[in-house]
Design a protein with these regions (language model features):
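Gram-negative/organellar outer-membrane beta-barrel architecture
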Residues: 1-101, 273-274, 279-304
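Membrane-embedded beta-strand positions of outer-membrane beta-barrel proteins
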Residues: 4, 14, 49-53, 102-106, ...
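Short coil turns and loop connectors of transmembrane beta-barrels in diderm outer membranes
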Residues: 8, 42-45, 90, 147-151, ...
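C-terminal outer-membrane beta-barrel translocator/porin domains of Gram-negative envelope proteins
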Residues: 66-225, 237-238, 245-247, 288-289, ...
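Outer-membrane beta-barrel transmembrane domain signature
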Residues: 198, 242-259
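Short glycine-rich, acidic/polar surface loops and turns
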Residues: 222, 259-265
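Short Gly/Pro-enriched loop/turn and capping motifs at secondary-structure junctions
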Residues: 226, 242-244, 271, 281-285
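Generic long, charged, amphipathic alpha-helical segments
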Residues: 231-237, 248, 252
Length: 304
């Protein structure tokens, strides 16, 4: 199918002295997306191919964001995204018992710096990032295995990489990976990708500027309590590990932050999917000497 969307938003700074919004300090975002998706007949009927052309314009006016190197300026993001997916999970999308889900996603911008003679090493950040350039690869896979009747094992593997065409510019401050916590991205303005890792506080496994590569594996044992049309409820236990890194040179795929825990999910057609997880993080939170320990996560909506 074909889809088209246009959106805009404004974010204002909060003046703590007057306890009011300061509209002189603002971030304006406008964007548009044109997309096309289709089901493929080859290699089999479970494949889908989605493509989209996306544009975002960020205008900062005396506005501070931790990942940006400037408070005043404009950044433009024109990217082309291709998503090849395969979904054979069934029989129900709420509680799959068999099959798998795969997605390989590539997101690329034009390599603007190849077409001009600018001295990017000495350019200020607001000019260096006026037209964002990067390429981003994501892989996500899930397998569902029926152990016994309503007891299901869900195995999950993920990988993401954000790269740069020009080392003088470096990796974009936008579109980075933030690992840890419940995985719900709310109030984020820099295109970041938030990855859940239960047993750790939100985004705690990523540096201040954001990661450029991440990987994650998880195993979730699910047991259906009730699967009625009015409400589906299942309990789960999980083991998972993941991490993010500031550069591909630092990437150590087996250096994972590990956790385990249990939770419950409730799906009601009127409210969607709701859940709560209790996770224990076995490893230290970066920048501290403390093991993460017990964390509580509230889940709203389907993940991935």
């Amino acid at each position: 199918g074909f889809n088209f969307s246009v959106y805009s938003s404004s974010q204002y700074a909060f003046d703590f002295q007057s306890r009011d919004v300061d509209k002189d300090q603002r971030l304006d975002i406008i964007g548009a997306t044109v997309g096309l998706s289709q089901r493929l007949k080859w290699p089999d009927d479970f494949f889908t191919l989605s493509t989209s052309l996306n544009y975002q314009r960020f205008v900062l006016n005396d506005f501070f964001l931790s990942t940006f190197g400037y408070n005043n300026g404009t950044s433009n993001n024109i990217n082309f995204t291709v998503n090849l997916g395969r979904n054979s999970a069934g029989p129900s999308p709420i509680y799959p018992r068999y099959g798998s889900q795969f997605n390989v996603i590539a997101e690329v911008t034009p390599p603007y710096s190849s077409f001009n003679d600018k001295d990017y090493i000495n350019l200020p950040d607001e000019q260096k990032y006026e037209w964002l350039e990067y390429y981003k690869i994501n892989f996500m896979g899930r397998w569902f295995t029926q152990i016994y009747k309503d007891l299901i094992l869900m195995s999950n593997a993920e990988f993401g990489f954000l790269g740069a065409y020009n080392q003088d510019i470096g990796v974009s401050p936008f579109e980075r990976f933030y690992v840890g916590g419940d995985g719900m991205a709310t109030g984020q303005f820099d295109g970041r990708q938030v990855i859940a890792l239960r047993g750790y506080p939100n985004s705690s496994l990523t540096s201040f500027a954001g990661g450029t590569v991440y990987n994650k594996i998880s195993f979730e044992l699910r047991y259906a309590i009730t699967l009625k049309p009015s409400a589906s409820i299942y309990a789960l236990t999980f083991l998972e590990g993941g991490n993010s890194f500031d550069s591909f040179q630092e990437f150590k795929p087996f250096e994972l932050k590990r956790s385990a825990g249990a939770g419950i999910r409730v799906f009601m057609p009127a409210f969607g999917l709701l859940g709560i997880d209790f996770g224990y993080g076995f490893d230290e939170i970066p920048g501290t000497d403390e093991i993460s320990g017990w964390q509580t996560h509230f889940i709203i909506g389907q993940q991935f």
